[in-house]
Amino acid sequence: MLTSRPGRSIFIFLLILSSLVIIAIIFFLPETLRSIAGNGSLRLAGIHQPLIRCFTKDPPYIQDRDGAYSPPKVTAKTFIEPLLLLKEKDILLSLIFGGTIYAIWSMVTSSTTGLFKQIFHLNELQLGLAFLPNGTSTFLFHLPFVQTDSPYQGLGTIVGSTIIGNLMNQAYRAAEDDYRTSHGLPASYSLPKKALPADFPIEHARLKHTKWITALFVISTSAYGFSLSTPAITSLPGWIAVPLLLQFFIAATSNAVFATNQTMVSDLCPGKGASSTAINNLVRCSMGAIGVAIVEQLIAGMGPGGAFLVLGLVTVAVVPLLVVQWYWGPMWRRERMGRKVKGAGS
């Protein structure tokens, strides 16, 4: 409907829609940061409470906070602390690998409109529907306990929770069982996830399934370009299903890497969940922005086949980062934990 109106109509629509969302947030959304709101039962004040609380009675479970409470202060260190994680070798390797996959997925997604409109002559509605395979597969490998930044989301969420979530949980439980057996711990003992022992192989547990997922991502990305490069093939009836299916696998495998990567970075930064999420988003979104900026020139210069083959080879080029992390990551993590213990004791 908006495509039939003047060019500014869509921006006016987005302005109205975003304004309604902001108003709803101001009126109804309370502060959820645990250090401020606790488990949701603490009385909020100032900007932390929604405006609706000014006109209604507090729920019966609301309690006054301890008088000794002092609100967390925002200082320069608050913004610098996430950047300091880049000094850690194992964390940096995880961020670079995850950022590379994110950039390539973003390049596939951002180039879809131009390629499909040119090759398959789709209208605006059909172009929108072409994103469904990408979007539903985003949730195919989405973890319910891991944050992702994917803008395309669909019914695959249900399937995703049972695939990558179960795979990662199984790998972690297997590693935990082996650790208990080797250390003579009772079967009922559960390792504290926020304070894992230095000799627990968390890197192996988290990266166990990354190898085949990355291989499938490389194959799908490389084949995707060639599925769009030959007019004699792309003109065949129903051929559009082939690149759409490959997009499904590209999005599914890339989002599996995102979920694994975010979990891995969080495990390497116990107690720094906000900082690890912030630096992960900063790195991969920066790399994604660079990729989106050059993808059109890459396709124009090499064609879809050559361009996406190069992107597949780029992924292969960063796979050694996983190998390095697999073998040397545990040592670097133990060294970091040792420095932390020494710092706390001094």
Regions found by a protein language model. Give the residues of each.
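Primarily residues marking transmembrane-helix entry/exit sites
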Residues: 87, 91-95, 236-241
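C-terminal transmembrane bundle
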Residues: 102, 106-346
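Central mid-sequence intracellular linker of multi-pass
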Residues: 6-92, 142-149, 166-188, 202, ...
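A single, central transmembrane helix in multi-pass transporters
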Residues: 93-103
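Generic, low-specificity signal for short hydrophobic/alpha-helical stretches with a mild N-terminal bias
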Residues: 61-68, 74-81, 98, 109, ...
